Amino acid sequence: MKTIKVTQIKSASHRLKNHKLCLQGLGLRRIGHTVEVQDTPSNRGMINKVYYMVSVEE
């Protein structure tokens, strides 16, 4: 399955609880942290929710 590189570029403090949980679900812990996740509809949904805090590379 295809993978996506996701990097956190903004802080999660003072954000909505659901958005913090999405970052946690993606495996992101801090600014500058990069993870590779599989390209699934659930991961895409989490990325779309926190689009303003992450950068995505195909």
Curated annotation (Swiss-Prot):
Keyword Ribonucleoprotein attached: yes
Pfam families reported for this sequence: Ribosomal_L30
Source domain of life: Bacteria
Residues spanning the signal sequence: none
Name under which the protein is recorded: Large ribosomal subunit protein uL30
Known partners and oligomeric status: Part of the 50S ribosomal subunit.
GO molecular function: structural constituent of ribosome
Organism: Acinetobacter baylyi (strain ATCC 33305 / BD413 / ADP1)
Entry's family note: Belongs to the universal ribosomal protein uL30 family.
Entry-linked InterPro entries: Ribo_uL30_ferredoxin-like_sf (IPR036919), Ribosomal_uL30_bac-type (IPR005996), Ribosomal_uL30_ferredoxin-like (IPR016082)
GO biological process, one term: translation
CDD domains per the UniProt record, alphabetical: Ribosomal_L30
Gene Ontology CC, one term: cytosolic large ribosomal subunit
Keywords: Ribonucleoprotein, Ribosomal protein
